[in-house]
Amino acid sequence: MRRSRGFRSKTRHKLQKVKRPGRSNPITRKIQSFNEGDLVHIIIDPSIHRGQPHPRFHGKTGRVVGMMGKSYVVALKDGNKDKQLVVRPEHLQMQE
């Protein structure tokens, strides 16, 4: 039987959550808001599957260009190509 090549394949360490006391999923990550033009880091929270971008974009930085429902549309470059991702706010962090 062929091996599965699912959405989360080869992410054993990339999507691993660091165990620290008192570090569950805070509600503030879910209700944070961004404005158009803000620079954000894509940091995937592996315990929340909804609105998760592909793991190849984990750690990348992009610019918020709009909203789509509760999610944000983030524009970034993947090599030479411009791409737009639809990502929920749990997987985004504001660049400082």
Swiss-Prot record:
Q: What's the family?
A: Belongs to the eukaryotic ribosomal protein eL21 family.
- HAMAP family, alphabetically? Ribosomal_eL21 (MF_00369)
Kindly give the InterPro entries that the UniProt entry links to this protein: Ribosomal_eL21, Ribosomal_eL21_arc, Ribosomal_eL21_CS, Ribosomal_eL21_sf, Translation_prot_SH3-like_sf
One GO location term (cellular component): ribonucleoprotein complex
Q: Provide the protein name.
A: Large ribosomal subunit protein eL21
What's a GO biological-process term for it? translation
Note the PROSITE patterns from the entry: RIBOSOMAL_L21E
Q: What residue ranges are annotated as transmembrane? A: none
Species source reads: Methanothermobacter thermautotrophicus (strain ATCC 29096 / DSM 1053 / JCM 10044 / NBRC 100330 / Delta H) (Methanobacterium thermoautotrophicum)
Q: Where is this region: Disordered?
A: 1-29
* Keyword Ribosomal protein carried by entry: yes
Q: Which UniProt keywords apply?
A: Ribonucleoprotein, Ribosomal protein
Alphabetized GO MF terms: structural constituent of ribosome
**Where in the sequence does UniProt note compositional bias of the Basic residues kind?**
1-22
